[in-house]
Amino acid sequence: MTTIFETLHEIGAAREEDREVYSEGTRDRDDVTVYRDRRSGVIYIDGFYGGDEVYEEGGYREKNLAKSGSRDYEIARDAERRATAYRPFVCGRTIVDFGCGDGSFLRKVQDETLSLCGVELQRDYVEALNRDGIRCHTSLEALENGSLDTAVSFHVLEHLPEPLPVLGALRRVLKPGGTAVIEVPHANDFLLRDLSCEAFKGFTLWSQHLVLHTRDSLRRLLAAAGFEAIAIEGVQRYPLSNHLTWLSSARPGGHKSALAALDTADLTNAYEAALNRIDATDTLVAIARNPA
């Protein structure tokens, strides 16, 4: 199996001589070292992968929505944001959500698409979606060549030890000229790069996240997979209240506390725009085209 470092090296986003230890351990494992490429800024874990079984069983998730039936606030909020932001690529289109989780995005847009399906490893999620009338497969191999207008994948790519073959499979199922929308966490997150918030660093580094990309490394990866017309934009998932709580109390959840009263639409949009100016959003989104 190719390691994520080998892939990063192949695309010119990491070199052995530029490797430095970023953290001795992650939030869930003391035996996993996290590295940073001092030249590119990419953050990565080399030589570790928990295995597909972890994702099939779903034990790594902090909440199992298929069992609890609850609607996690962050997941619901993300689904709403994505449905609005990516509507031009979804409305009236045939789409697949690769790594769809409990299907929050698919459920949100199902009345707007021409057809839709999900791909997900976690077995109970697959069963629940199929039971609810949303087609869900465990592999892209179930989908025909050139059959879809749009492929979306939200916070999945960073989990993959070999992302290039997966991106190639996404290209295979897309029609010529089809669109891929890829969302990943950002190595230049304001709390990490600019504020050096150790509490947040200890929380956000996770053995399941094998890489935190920069704009450049994400663009290189998609280009290496054969995509073209690649546009990268920054998105801020967590608002000012969240950052204030990390800085004042060294804990997550500020966006669900009394401080959330600060997060008016105007302030939230302005904060995201300000972070974009310095390339410090917590999330990157790539929108890319499959060659015609």
Which role fits each region the language model picked out?
Residues 227-237:
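Conserved S-adenosyl-L-methionine
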Residues 1-146, 150-154, 163-169, 234-235, ...:
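Conserved N-terminal segment of class I S-adenosyl-L-methionine
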Residues 125, 188-190, 236-239:
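Feature marks short, surface-exposed loop/turn motifs that line or immediately flank catalytic pockets
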Residues 116, 180-182:
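Hydrophobic/aromatic residues located in beta-strands of well-ordered beta-sheets
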Residues 154-161, 183:
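Short catalytic micro-motifs in class I SAM-dependent methyltransferases
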